[in-house]
């Protein structure tokens, strides 16, 4: 029974942390995953969104900060107006807030996202 629960838990963790990987037009490459600060883990990804690509609504159990390398990121963030971030601009997503990133442009969107999230929790969870 415990083995089954461990397997199910692992599947749920993998599914929740691969929110981007399951969506058409979005590619994610993990650059770094490291424990720290205490009780947290730091994850750095580079993401590429094809024109028209859009994430599912989701949350993170910690802070997300990012930097747009190419294109324009349109970000819907719970409690804030929708904002477009162009190449060379940085953005921040509050812990636990529902948000959606999208590429409304005609060119590739590429950005770096750094998460500092609670250890042993999924890095990303679909929002209700």
Where are these regions (language model features)?
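Bacterial N-terminal signal peptides
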Residues: 4-16
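Sec/Tat signal peptide C-region and signal peptidase I cleavage site
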Residues: 17-23
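A short glycine-rich, His/Asp/Glu-containing loop-to-beta-strand
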Residues: 24-56, 114
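All-alpha RGS (Regulator of G-protein Signaling) helical domain and cognate RGS-like helical scaffolds
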Residues: 25-26, 83-86, 90-91, 122-128
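Short acidic-glycine-tyrosine-enriched beta hairpin
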Residues: 49-50, 79-96
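Histidine-centered metal-chelating micro-motifs
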Residues: 54-56, 74, 91, 95-102
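Glycine- and acidic-residue-biased ligand/ion/polar-headgroup-sensing regions
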Residues: 60-79, 89
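Ligand-binding loop in jelly-roll beta-barrel domains
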Residues: 96-121
């Amino acid at each position: 029974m415990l083995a089954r629960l461990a397997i199910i838990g692992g599947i749920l963790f993998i599914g929740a942390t691969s929110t981007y990987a399951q969506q058409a037009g979005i590619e994610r490459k993990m650059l770094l995953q490291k424990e720290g600060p205490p009780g947290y883990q730091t994850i750095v990804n580079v993401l590429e969104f094809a024109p028209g690509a859009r994430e599912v609504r989701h949350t993170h159990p910690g802070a997300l900060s990012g930097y747009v390398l190419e294109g324009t990121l349109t970000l819907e963030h719970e409690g804030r107006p929708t904002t477009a971030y162009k190449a060379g601009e940085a953005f921040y997503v509050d812990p636990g807030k529902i948000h959606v990133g999208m590429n409304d442009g005609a060119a590739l969107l590429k950005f770096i996202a750094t998460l500092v999230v609670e250890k042993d929790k999924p890095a990303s969870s679909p929002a209700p």
